[in-house]
Protein backbone atom coordinates (compact mmCIF):
# COMPACT_ATOMS: atom_id res chain seq x y z
CA UNK A 1 0.00 0.00 0.00
CA UNK A 2 1.33 3.45 -0.89
CA UNK A 3 1.97 6.16 1.70
CA UNK A 4 -1.08 8.02 0.41
CA UNK A 5 -3.20 4.90 0.75
CA UNK A 6 -2.03 4.37 4.33
CA UNK A 7 -2.72 8.02 5.14
CA UNK A 8 -6.26 7.82 3.77
CA UNK A 9 -6.89 4.55 5.63
CA UNK A 10 -5.78 6.11 8.94
CA UNK A 11 -7.91 9.20 8.33
CA UNK A 12 -10.86 7.02 7.49
CA UNK A 13 -10.57 4.97 10.69
CA UNK A 14 -10.05 8.09 12.80
CA UNK A 15 -13.10 9.84 11.44
CA UNK A 16 -15.28 6.74 11.71
CA UNK A 17 -14.31 6.18 15.32
CA UNK A 18 -14.71 9.78 16.43
CA UNK A 19 -17.89 10.77 14.63
CA UNK A 20 -21.10 8.85 15.09
CA UNK A 21 -23.99 11.23 14.76
CA UNK A 22 -27.41 10.10 15.94
CA UNK A 23 -29.79 9.42 13.13
CA UNK A 24 -32.77 11.51 14.06
CA UNK A 25 -35.27 13.44 12.03
CA UNK A 26 -34.48 16.59 14.01
CA UNK A 27 -30.78 16.57 13.05
CA UNK A 28 -29.67 19.49 10.91
CA UNK A 29 -26.49 17.79 9.69
CA UNK A 30 -25.67 17.27 6.03
CA UNK A 31 -26.49 13.63 5.21
CA UNK A 32 -23.44 13.42 2.95
CA UNK A 33 -20.52 15.02 4.83
CA UNK A 34 -22.02 15.75 8.30
CA UNK A 35 -21.47 19.51 8.01
CA UNK A 36 -24.21 21.96 9.02
CA UNK A 37 -27.03 21.52 6.51
CA UNK A 38 -28.44 24.62 4.83
CA UNK A 39 -31.63 23.09 3.51
CA UNK A 40 -33.01 20.42 1.22
CA UNK A 41 -31.07 20.41 -2.02
CA UNK A 42 -32.26 18.16 -4.84
CA UNK A 43 -34.65 16.57 -2.31
CA UNK A 44 -31.93 15.65 0.20
CA UNK A 45 -30.88 17.43 3.40
CA UNK A 46 -27.36 18.70 2.72
CA UNK A 47 -24.91 21.55 3.02
CA UNK A 48 -24.28 24.04 0.22
CA UNK A 49 -20.88 22.53 -0.60
CA UNK A 50 -22.27 19.04 -1.26
CA UNK A 51 -25.17 20.55 -3.20
CA UNK A 52 -22.72 22.49 -5.37
CA UNK A 53 -20.58 19.38 -5.88
CA UNK A 54 -23.62 17.35 -6.94
CA UNK A 55 -24.82 20.11 -9.28
CA UNK A 56 -21.45 20.37 -11.04
CA UNK A 57 -21.08 16.60 -11.30
CA UNK A 58 -24.49 16.17 -12.93
CA UNK A 59 -24.37 19.31 -15.08
CA UNK A 60 -20.91 18.47 -16.46
CA UNK A 61 -21.67 14.70 -16.65
CA UNK A 62 -18.50 13.91 -14.74
CA UNK A 63 -17.49 10.38 -13.80
CA UNK A 64 -15.01 9.54 -11.05
CA UNK A 65 -12.91 6.59 -9.94
CA UNK A 66 -12.48 5.79 -6.25
CA UNK A 67 -9.05 6.90 -5.05
CA UNK A 68 -8.61 3.70 -3.04
CA UNK A 69 -10.38 1.37 -5.47
CA UNK A 70 -12.66 0.01 -2.73
CA UNK A 71 -15.66 2.35 -3.14
CA UNK A 72 -16.11 2.63 0.63
CA UNK A 73 -14.24 5.83 1.52
CA UNK A 74 -15.45 7.91 4.43
CA UNK A 75 -16.89 11.31 3.51
CA UNK A 76 -16.56 14.02 6.16
CA UNK A 77 -16.33 17.78 5.79
CA UNK A 78 -13.18 18.07 7.96
CA UNK A 79 -11.08 15.79 5.74
CA UNK A 80 -8.38 17.26 3.51
CA UNK A 81 -9.09 14.93 0.61
CA UNK A 82 -12.58 13.61 -0.02
CA UNK A 83 -12.99 10.86 -2.60
CA UNK A 84 -15.22 12.38 -5.27
CA UNK A 85 -16.51 9.00 -6.44
CA UNK A 86 -17.68 7.99 -2.95
CA UNK A 87 -19.06 11.47 -2.30
CA UNK A 88 -21.17 11.29 -5.46
CA UNK A 89 -22.45 7.82 -4.56
CA UNK A 90 -23.34 9.02 -1.08
CA UNK A 91 -25.25 11.95 -2.58
CA UNK A 92 -27.31 9.50 -4.63
CA UNK A 93 -27.81 7.03 -1.79
CA UNK A 94 -29.10 9.79 0.48
CA UNK A 95 -31.76 10.85 -1.95
CA UNK A 96 -30.31 13.53 -4.21
CA UNK A 97 -32.15 13.51 -7.55
CA UNK A 98 -30.10 14.17 -10.71
CA UNK A 99 -33.32 15.24 -12.38
CA UNK A 100 -33.45 18.22 -10.06
CA UNK A 101 -30.36 19.75 -11.66
CA UNK A 102 -31.61 22.23 -14.22
CA UNK A 103 -29.67 23.82 -17.07
CA UNK A 104 -28.51 27.38 -16.58
CA UNK A 105 -31.40 29.79 -16.95
CA UNK A 106 -31.20 33.07 -18.87
CA UNK A 107 -31.06 36.26 -16.84
CA UNK A 108 -34.62 37.25 -16.02
CA UNK A 109 -35.47 40.46 -14.22
CA UNK A 110 -37.52 38.83 -11.52
CA UNK A 111 -36.83 38.55 -7.83
CA UNK A 112 -36.79 35.37 -5.80
CA UNK A 113 -39.95 34.51 -3.88
CA UNK A 114 -38.54 34.41 -0.38
CA UNK A 115 -41.81 34.38 1.54
CA UNK A 116 -43.11 30.95 0.64
CA UNK A 117 -44.31 28.40 3.15
CA UNK A 118 -41.55 25.97 2.24
CA UNK A 119 -38.95 28.74 2.40
CA UNK A 120 -40.08 29.93 5.82
CA UNK A 121 -40.11 26.36 7.11
CA UNK A 122 -36.60 25.73 5.78
CA UNK A 123 -35.21 28.98 7.18
CA UNK A 124 -36.69 28.27 10.60
CA UNK A 125 -35.26 24.76 10.74
CA UNK A 126 -31.73 25.53 9.55
CA UNK A 127 -31.36 29.04 10.97
CA UNK A 128 -29.53 27.87 14.10
CA UNK A 129 -26.14 26.34 13.38
CA UNK A 130 -25.40 23.29 15.48
CA UNK A 131 -22.17 23.82 17.45
CA UNK A 132 -19.22 21.55 16.76
CA UNK A 133 -18.73 18.73 19.19
CA UNK A 134 -15.50 18.50 21.19
CA UNK A 135 -14.35 15.60 19.01
CA UNK A 136 -15.00 17.59 15.84
CA UNK A 137 -13.06 20.57 17.10
CA UNK A 138 -10.16 18.33 18.11
CA UNK A 139 -10.07 16.59 14.72
CA UNK A 140 -10.18 19.85 12.80
CA UNK A 141 -7.38 21.42 14.86
CA UNK A 142 -5.20 18.31 14.77
CA UNK A 143 -5.87 17.28 11.21
CA UNK A 144 -5.70 20.61 9.41
CA UNK A 145 -2.28 22.12 8.93
CA UNK A 146 -3.29 24.62 6.23
CA UNK A 147 -5.51 27.66 6.76
CA UNK A 148 -8.73 26.40 5.31
CA UNK A 149 -11.35 28.43 3.52
CA UNK A 150 -14.73 27.02 2.72
CA UNK A 151 -16.36 29.13 0.05
CA UNK A 152 -19.67 27.36 0.10
CA UNK A 153 -21.59 27.74 -3.10
CA UNK A 154 -25.21 28.70 -2.39
CA UNK A 155 -28.11 26.74 -3.77
CA UNK A 156 -28.71 29.08 -6.69
CA UNK A 157 -27.07 31.78 -8.71
CA UNK A 158 -29.48 34.30 -7.20
CA UNK A 159 -28.13 33.44 -3.76
CA UNK A 160 -24.63 34.10 -5.00
CA UNK A 161 -25.47 37.49 -6.41
CA UNK A 162 -27.50 38.66 -3.43
CA UNK A 163 -25.33 37.38 -0.60
CA UNK A 164 -21.93 38.29 -2.09
CA UNK A 165 -20.09 37.04 0.97
CA UNK A 166 -17.88 34.09 1.84
CA UNK A 167 -18.05 31.59 4.67
CA UNK A 168 -14.54 31.32 6.01
CA UNK A 169 -12.94 29.11 8.63
CA UNK A 170 -9.29 29.52 9.54
CA UNK A 171 -8.31 27.03 12.25
CA UNK A 172 -4.95 27.42 13.92
CA UNK A 173 -2.55 24.78 12.57
CA UNK A 174 -1.04 22.51 15.17
CA UNK A 175 2.71 22.49 15.68
CA UNK A 176 4.38 19.74 13.71
CA UNK A 177 7.92 18.57 13.30
CA UNK A 178 9.85 19.65 10.26
CA UNK A 179 10.26 16.11 9.03
CA UNK A 180 6.54 15.45 9.22
CA UNK A 181 5.79 18.64 7.35
CA UNK A 182 8.23 17.86 4.57
CA UNK A 183 7.14 14.30 3.99
CA UNK A 184 3.45 15.03 4.20
CA UNK A 185 3.55 17.51 1.37
CA UNK A 186 3.77 14.81 -1.27
CA UNK A 187 0.89 12.73 -0.02
CA UNK A 188 -1.59 15.25 1.33
CA UNK A 189 -4.08 16.95 -0.92
CA UNK A 190 -4.29 20.58 0.09
CA UNK A 191 -7.43 22.29 1.20
CA UNK A 192 -8.69 25.37 -0.49
CA UNK A 193 -6.97 28.46 0.93
CA UNK A 194 -8.58 30.52 3.61
CA UNK A 195 -8.23 34.26 3.74
CA UNK A 196 -11.08 36.61 4.44
CA UNK A 197 -11.56 39.75 2.36
CA UNK A 198 -12.05 41.52 5.69
CA UNK A 199 -8.81 40.21 7.23
CA UNK A 200 -6.35 42.96 8.17
CA UNK A 201 -3.57 43.37 5.63
CA UNK A 202 -0.68 45.76 5.79
CA UNK A 203 -0.95 48.77 3.51
CA UNK A 204 1.04 48.68 0.30
CA UNK A 205 0.76 48.49 -3.48
CA UNK A 206 -2.13 46.48 -4.86
CA UNK A 207 -0.78 42.93 -4.99
CA UNK A 208 -2.80 41.89 -8.06
CA UNK A 209 -1.49 44.90 -9.98
CA UNK A 210 2.09 43.90 -9.13
CA UNK A 211 1.60 40.33 -10.33
CA UNK A 212 -0.18 41.50 -13.50
CA UNK A 213 2.85 43.63 -14.38
CA UNK A 214 5.18 40.71 -13.66
CA UNK A 215 3.07 38.36 -15.80
CA UNK A 216 3.30 40.79 -18.72
CA UNK A 217 7.08 40.95 -18.24
CA UNK A 218 7.14 37.14 -18.25
CA UNK A 219 5.38 37.09 -21.63
CA UNK A 220 7.88 39.57 -23.07
CA UNK A 221 10.83 37.52 -21.79
CA UNK A 222 9.43 34.35 -23.35
CA UNK A 223 9.13 36.06 -26.74
CA UNK A 224 12.75 37.22 -26.49
CA UNK A 225 13.98 33.78 -25.46
CA UNK A 226 11.95 31.42 -27.62
CA UNK A 227 10.24 33.27 -30.50
CA UNK A 228 11.91 33.42 -33.91
CA UNK A 229 9.87 36.30 -35.32
CA UNK A 230 11.38 39.64 -36.43
CA UNK A 231 13.28 41.50 -33.73
CA UNK A 232 11.08 44.58 -34.07
CA UNK A 233 8.06 42.62 -32.83
CA UNK A 234 9.66 40.97 -29.79
CA UNK A 235 9.45 43.79 -27.28
CA UNK A 236 6.32 45.05 -25.57
CA UNK A 237 4.48 44.15 -22.40
CA UNK A 238 0.81 43.31 -22.82
CA UNK A 239 -1.87 40.86 -21.71
CA UNK A 240 -1.91 38.91 -24.96
CA UNK A 241 -0.36 35.50 -25.55
CA UNK A 242 3.40 35.88 -26.12
CA UNK A 243 3.15 33.58 -29.15
CA UNK A 244 1.11 33.71 -32.32
CA UNK A 245 -0.15 30.62 -34.10
CA UNK A 246 2.72 30.82 -36.58
CA UNK A 247 5.25 30.92 -33.70
CA UNK A 248 4.41 27.57 -32.13
CA UNK A 249 6.28 24.47 -33.22
CA UNK A 250 6.25 20.75 -32.36
CA UNK A 251 7.71 20.08 -28.92
CA UNK A 252 11.00 18.22 -28.63
CA UNK A 253 11.37 16.83 -25.11
CA UNK A 254 15.17 16.96 -25.31
CA UNK A 255 15.15 20.66 -26.22
CA UNK A 256 12.66 21.49 -23.48
CA UNK A 257 14.85 19.75 -20.90
CA UNK A 258 17.85 21.83 -21.97
CA UNK A 259 15.90 25.04 -21.25
CA UNK A 260 14.45 23.90 -17.92
CA UNK A 261 16.78 26.08 -15.82
CA UNK A 262 15.68 29.09 -17.85
CA UNK A 263 12.04 28.40 -17.00
CA UNK A 264 12.90 27.96 -13.32
CA UNK A 265 14.82 31.25 -13.34
CA UNK A 266 11.81 33.04 -14.86
CA UNK A 267 9.61 31.63 -12.09
CA UNK A 268 12.07 32.81 -9.44
CA UNK A 269 12.00 36.33 -10.89
CA UNK A 270 8.19 36.18 -10.81
CA UNK A 271 8.30 35.06 -7.16
CA UNK A 272 10.51 37.99 -6.17
CA UNK A 273 7.54 40.28 -6.80
CA UNK A 274 6.58 39.35 -3.23
CA UNK A 275 8.53 41.73 -0.94
CA UNK A 276 8.42 39.43 2.10
CA UNK A 277 10.31 36.72 0.21
CA UNK A 278 13.56 38.07 1.64
CA UNK A 279 12.27 37.50 5.18
CA UNK A 280 12.35 33.73 4.61
CA UNK A 281 15.47 31.64 5.10
CA UNK A 282 17.08 29.75 2.23
CA UNK A 283 15.14 26.53 2.76
CA UNK A 284 11.81 28.34 3.02
CA UNK A 285 12.51 30.28 -0.17
CA UNK A 286 13.51 27.10 -1.97
CA UNK A 287 10.37 25.32 -0.76
CA UNK A 288 8.21 28.15 -2.04
CA UNK A 289 10.12 28.20 -5.33
CA UNK A 290 9.54 24.46 -5.76
CA UNK A 291 5.79 24.90 -5.40
CA UNK A 292 5.78 27.95 -7.69
CA UNK A 293 7.68 26.03 -10.40
CA UNK A 294 5.20 23.16 -10.15
CA UNK A 295 2.18 25.47 -10.40
CA UNK A 296 3.66 27.38 -13.35
CA UNK A 297 4.35 24.12 -15.19
CA UNK A 298 0.66 23.20 -14.86
CA UNK A 299 -1.10 26.53 -15.32
CA UNK A 300 1.05 28.29 -17.91
CA UNK A 301 0.49 25.64 -20.62
CA UNK A 302 -3.23 25.69 -19.76
CA UNK A 303 -3.55 29.45 -20.23
CA UNK A 304 -1.25 29.65 -23.26
CA UNK A 305 -3.35 26.99 -24.99
CA UNK A 306 -6.54 28.82 -23.98
CA UNK A 307 -5.18 32.09 -25.42
CA UNK A 308 -3.97 30.53 -28.68
CA UNK A 309 -7.35 28.87 -29.21
CA UNK A 310 -6.09 25.57 -30.64
CA UNK A 311 -8.05 22.89 -28.72
CA UNK A 312 -6.06 20.01 -30.23
CA UNK A 313 -2.71 21.40 -29.04
CA UNK A 314 -1.15 21.90 -25.61
CA UNK A 315 1.28 24.84 -25.79
CA UNK A 316 4.31 24.69 -23.50
CA UNK A 317 6.20 27.68 -22.07
CA UNK A 318 8.81 27.63 -24.85
CA UNK A 319 6.22 27.71 -27.63
CA UNK A 320 6.46 23.99 -28.36
CA UNK A 321 3.22 22.01 -28.62
CA UNK A 322 2.07 18.42 -28.34
CA UNK A 323 -1.07 16.94 -29.83
CA UNK A 324 -3.93 16.43 -27.39
CA UNK A 325 -6.08 14.57 -29.93
CA UNK A 326 -3.59 12.00 -31.23
CA UNK A 327 -1.26 10.51 -28.62
CA UNK A 328 0.85 9.05 -31.42
CA UNK A 329 1.03 12.35 -33.30
CA UNK A 330 3.03 15.55 -32.98
CA UNK A 331 5.26 15.63 -29.90
CA UNK A 332 4.80 11.97 -29.02
CA UNK A 333 7.40 10.52 -31.39
CA UNK A 334 10.40 8.49 -30.25
CA UNK A 335 13.48 10.48 -29.28
CA UNK A 336 17.02 9.44 -28.46
CA UNK A 337 16.48 10.32 -24.79
CA UNK A 338 12.96 8.96 -24.32
CA UNK A 339 10.73 6.62 -26.29
CA UNK A 340 7.25 7.52 -27.48
CA UNK A 341 5.88 4.71 -25.32
CA UNK A 342 7.38 6.21 -22.16
CA UNK A 343 6.18 9.67 -23.17
CA UNK A 344 2.64 8.36 -23.38
CA UNK A 345 2.92 6.36 -20.15
CA UNK A 346 4.15 9.21 -17.96
CA UNK A 347 3.03 12.41 -19.66
CA UNK A 348 -0.38 11.64 -21.17
CA UNK A 349 -1.94 11.33 -17.66
CA UNK A 350 -0.49 14.73 -16.72
CA UNK A 351 -1.68 16.25 -19.99
CA UNK A 352 -5.19 14.85 -19.52
CA UNK A 353 -5.44 16.39 -16.06
CA UNK A 354 -4.64 19.75 -17.63
CA UNK A 355 -6.98 19.35 -20.61
CA UNK A 356 -9.83 17.61 -18.75
CA UNK A 357 -9.78 19.24 -15.30
CA UNK A 358 -8.11 22.66 -15.50
CA UNK A 359 -8.71 24.03 -19.00
CA UNK A 360 -12.48 23.31 -19.17
CA UNK A 361 -13.03 25.44 -16.06
CA UNK A 362 -11.04 28.28 -17.66
CA UNK A 363 -13.03 28.02 -20.87
CA UNK A 364 -16.40 27.74 -19.11
CA UNK A 365 -15.92 30.98 -17.18
CA UNK A 366 -13.97 32.64 -20.02
CA UNK A 367 -11.23 33.45 -17.56
CA UNK A 368 -9.62 36.87 -17.92
CA UNK A 369 -5.93 37.69 -17.77
CA UNK A 370 -6.37 39.26 -14.33
CA UNK A 371 -8.24 36.22 -13.00
CA UNK A 372 -5.55 33.88 -14.30
CA UNK A 373 -2.86 35.94 -12.58
CA UNK A 374 -4.80 35.79 -9.31
CA UNK A 375 -5.40 32.04 -9.67
CA UNK A 376 -1.71 31.33 -10.24
CA UNK A 377 -0.62 33.49 -7.32
CA UNK A 378 -3.17 31.86 -5.00
CA UNK A 379 -2.09 28.36 -6.02
CA UNK A 380 1.62 29.15 -5.56
CA UNK A 381 1.36 30.72 -2.12
CA UNK A 382 -1.33 28.48 -0.67
CA UNK A 383 0.38 25.39 -2.05
CA UNK A 384 3.69 26.51 -0.55
CA UNK A 385 2.21 27.07 2.92
CA UNK A 386 2.77 23.46 3.96
CA UNK A 387 6.56 23.48 3.71
CA UNK A 388 7.34 26.95 5.02
CA UNK A 389 8.59 26.95 8.60
CA UNK A 390 5.86 27.50 11.15
CA UNK A 391 7.33 30.81 12.32
CA UNK A 392 6.90 32.30 8.82
CA UNK A 393 3.55 30.85 7.82
CA UNK A 394 1.73 34.00 8.87
CA UNK A 395 3.48 35.78 5.98
CA UNK A 396 2.00 33.30 3.52
CA UNK A 397 -1.46 33.70 5.06
CA UNK A 398 -1.19 37.49 4.80
CA UNK A 399 -0.19 37.24 1.15
CA UNK A 400 -3.10 34.95 0.31
CA UNK A 401 -5.41 37.40 2.08
CA UNK A 402 -4.03 40.26 0.00
CA UNK A 403 -4.47 38.38 -3.27
CA UNK A 404 -8.08 37.48 -2.57
CA UNK A 405 -8.92 40.96 -1.32
CA UNK A 406 -7.27 42.46 -4.39
CA UNK A 407 -9.21 40.16 -6.74
CA UNK A 408 -12.46 41.08 -5.03
CA UNK A 409 -11.62 44.78 -5.37
CA UNK A 410 -10.83 44.23 -9.06
CA UNK A 411 -14.31 42.80 -9.57
CA UNK A 412 -15.93 45.76 -7.83
CA UNK A 413 -13.92 48.33 -9.77
CA UNK A 414 -14.86 46.68 -13.08
CA UNK A 415 -18.56 46.39 -12.17
CA UNK A 416 -18.54 42.61 -12.52
CA UNK A 417 -22.14 41.39 -12.19
CA UNK A 418 -21.39 37.85 -11.02
CA UNK A 419 -18.69 38.50 -8.45
CA UNK A 420 -19.44 35.62 -6.11
CA UNK A 421 -19.85 33.10 -8.93
CA UNK A 422 -16.53 33.97 -10.59
CA UNK A 423 -14.71 34.32 -7.26
CA UNK A 424 -16.00 30.93 -6.13
CA UNK A 425 -15.01 29.29 -9.43
CA UNK A 426 -11.43 30.54 -9.04
CA UNK A 427 -11.22 29.10 -5.52
CA UNK A 428 -12.81 25.78 -6.50
CA UNK A 429 -10.24 25.31 -9.28
CA UNK A 430 -7.46 25.07 -6.70
CA UNK A 431 -8.44 21.54 -5.68
CA UNK A 432 -7.88 20.12 -9.18
CA UNK A 433 -4.63 22.07 -9.51
CA UNK A 434 -3.21 20.66 -6.27
CA UNK A 435 -4.29 17.12 -7.21
CA UNK A 436 -2.58 17.45 -10.60
CA UNK A 437 0.51 18.80 -8.84
CA UNK A 438 0.75 15.79 -6.54
CA UNK A 439 0.45 13.42 -9.51
CA UNK A 440 3.05 15.43 -11.45
CA UNK A 441 5.58 15.00 -8.63
CA UNK A 442 4.87 11.28 -8.20
CA UNK A 443 5.22 10.62 -11.95
CA UNK A 444 8.59 12.36 -12.12
CA UNK A 445 9.86 10.57 -9.04
CA UNK A 446 8.99 7.31 -10.76
CA UNK A 447 10.80 8.53 -13.88
CA UNK A 448 13.86 9.21 -11.73
CA UNK A 449 13.72 5.92 -9.80
CA UNK A 450 13.42 3.75 -12.92
CA UNK A 451 15.78 5.92 -15.02
CA UNK A 452 13.16 6.44 -17.73
CA UNK A 453 15.12 9.43 -18.98
CA UNK A 454 17.64 11.87 -17.55
CA UNK A 455 15.94 14.73 -15.75
CA UNK A 456 17.74 17.99 -15.09
CA UNK A 457 19.77 17.88 -11.86
CA UNK A 458 18.09 21.00 -10.47
CA UNK A 459 14.68 19.48 -11.15
CA UNK A 460 15.73 16.33 -9.30
CA UNK A 461 16.81 18.37 -6.29
CA UNK A 462 13.50 20.25 -6.28
CA UNK A 463 11.58 16.97 -6.51
CA UNK A 464 13.50 15.54 -3.57
CA UNK A 465 13.79 18.76 -1.59
CA UNK A 466 11.76 17.39 1.32
CA UNK A 467 14.23 14.52 1.79
CA UNK A 468 17.21 16.85 1.48
CA UNK A 469 15.77 19.22 4.07
CA UNK A 470 14.86 16.35 6.39
CA UNK A 471 18.43 15.04 6.21
CA UNK A 472 19.84 18.51 6.88
CA UNK A 473 17.54 18.97 9.87
CA UNK A 474 18.48 15.55 11.27
CA UNK A 475 22.21 16.19 10.88
CA UNK A 476 21.88 19.58 12.57
CA UNK A 477 19.99 18.00 15.47
CA UNK A 478 22.61 15.25 15.79
CA UNK A 479 25.46 17.77 15.92
CA UNK A 480 23.64 19.79 18.56
CA UNK A 481 23.04 16.64 20.61
CA UNK A 482 26.68 15.60 20.38
CA UNK A 483 27.78 19.02 21.63
CA UNK A 484 25.48 18.53 24.62
CA UNK A 485 26.92 15.07 25.35
CA UNK A 486 23.85 13.08 24.28
CA UNK A 487 24.04 9.62 22.69
CA UNK A 488 22.87 9.76 19.07
CA UNK A 489 22.39 6.51 17.17
CA UNK A 490 21.69 6.21 13.46
CA UNK A 491 18.59 4.53 11.98
CA UNK A 492 20.23 1.11 11.98
CA UNK A 493 21.06 1.42 15.67
CA UNK A 494 24.58 0.14 15.07
CA UNK A 495 26.78 3.22 14.84
CA UNK A 496 27.41 5.39 17.87
CA UNK A 497 27.69 9.01 16.76
CA UNK A 498 28.08 10.70 20.12
CA UNK A 499 29.43 9.94 23.54
CA UNK A 500 27.41 10.52 26.68
CA UNK A 501 30.56 10.99 28.68
CA UNK A 502 33.23 13.27 27.46
CA UNK A 503 36.72 11.96 28.20
CA UNK A 504 39.10 14.47 29.54
Swiss-Prot record:
It comes from the Eukaryota. Residues 214-466 form the NR LBD domain. Disruption phenotype: RNAi-mediated knockdown causes a change in fatty acid composition, including an increase in saturated fatty acid 18:0 and decrease in unsaturated 18:1. In a fatty acid desaturase fat-6 mutant background, become thin, slow growing, reproductively inviable after 4 days, and accumulate very high levels of 18:0 saturated fatty acid. In a fat-6 mutant background, also drastically reduces expression of fat-7. In either a fat-5 or fat-7 mutant background, accumulates high levels of 18:0 saturated fatty acid, but less so than in the fat-6 mutant background. GO terms for cellular component: nucleus. A zinc finger (NR C4-type) spans 30-50, 66-86. Its main location: nucleus. It is found in: Nucleus. Residues 455-466 are annotated as: AF-2. Residues 177-192 have a biased composition (Low complexity). The keyword Amino-acid biosynthesis does not apply. GO terms for molecular function: DNA-binding transcription factor activity; RNA polymerase II cis-regulatory region sequence-specific DNA binding; zinc ion binding. Residues 177-199 are annotated as: Disordered. Residues 27-103 bind DNA. Induction: Expression increased by citrate dietary supplementation. Belongs to the nuclear hormone receptor family. Transcription factor. Binds to regulatory elements and regulates transcription of target genes, including acyltransferase dgat-2. As part of a lysosome-to-nucleus retrograde lipid signaling pathway, acts as a direct nuclear receptor of oleoylethanolamide (OEA) and, acting in concert with nuclear hormone receptor nhr-49, activates the transcription of genes promoting longevity and mitochondrial beta-oxidation. Required to modulate expression of delta-9 fatty acid desaturases, thereby regulating lipid metabolism; in some contexts, acting in concert with nhr-49. This is Nuclear hormone receptor family member nhr-80.
